[in-house]
């Protein structure tokens, strides 16, 4: 059994680690709430643009934006959004597994893939597999700006416009709640039909006068919508990261508390054994006299 002094040193070390994990848990909780606010604020903007796009695309007879035209799919581009930092449980691992499974399914259909990567964890992971990476970005921080994301996104959209790829998807962790984050791979372009499109057809029987013409408006709205979708995915992933880190750090703090209790028990036993030995030596010495 280790000596009492050595055990006491271990207890102090674990207590120091516990303070760090507790602080990280509190920081993650605060950041998660702020990110949730940004997530909630940006969602109505994205949903409204989507509804307007649906209406304008139907009004613009004879014109189909490239982002609305479906074709035979032979190559797909995927924007993968991961974290820059670790200590967030299996968040990135689950996302990478989901993405790789989707890529495998496409490969079985003779569909190849190009990647655009956001987040240092995804960059290091997918580079090791030898994928064709068209663009990458890391170091976004806790308050990402849309201007930083546009570069990687435009790499994919330009490839789509030029016919190098036939569809663009985005993979990220969708924030469900504090205890649940779901890895998803969803289509960006060609723009999939929204569930609300048919509902809008039934509810809106009127038309609008467009300035400028519907074509120019549709071109602008589609770009804004796709940018908002990418921003929303990044913010969703950030909220998921902070939630996962909060849960992981809470578990680490609780485990540290349990370990401290176990070490204190061992320390008390070692101290008791030491006192018993000293008493035995005193009794033996007295008996010898």
UniProtKB/Swiss-Prot annotation:
Species, as recorded: Haemophilus influenzae (strain 86-028NP)
Alphabetical GO biological process terms: proton motive force-driven plasma membrane ATP synthesis
Source lineage: Bacteria, Pseudomonadati, Pseudomonadota, Gammaproteobacteria, Pasteurellales
Chain's gene name: atpG
Membrane-topology annotation of the record: Peripheral membrane protein
Protein name (Swiss-Prot/TrEMBL): ATP synthase gamma chain
GO CC aspect terms: plasma membrane; proton-transporting ATP synthase complex
Annotated Gene3D superfamilies: 3.40.1380.10, ATP synthase, gamma subunit, helix hairpin domain
Chief place of localization: membrane
Summary of the function given for this chain in its UniProt record: Produces ATP from ADP in the presence of a proton gradient across the membrane. The gamma chain is believed to be important in regulating ATPase activity and the flow of protons through the CF(0) complex.
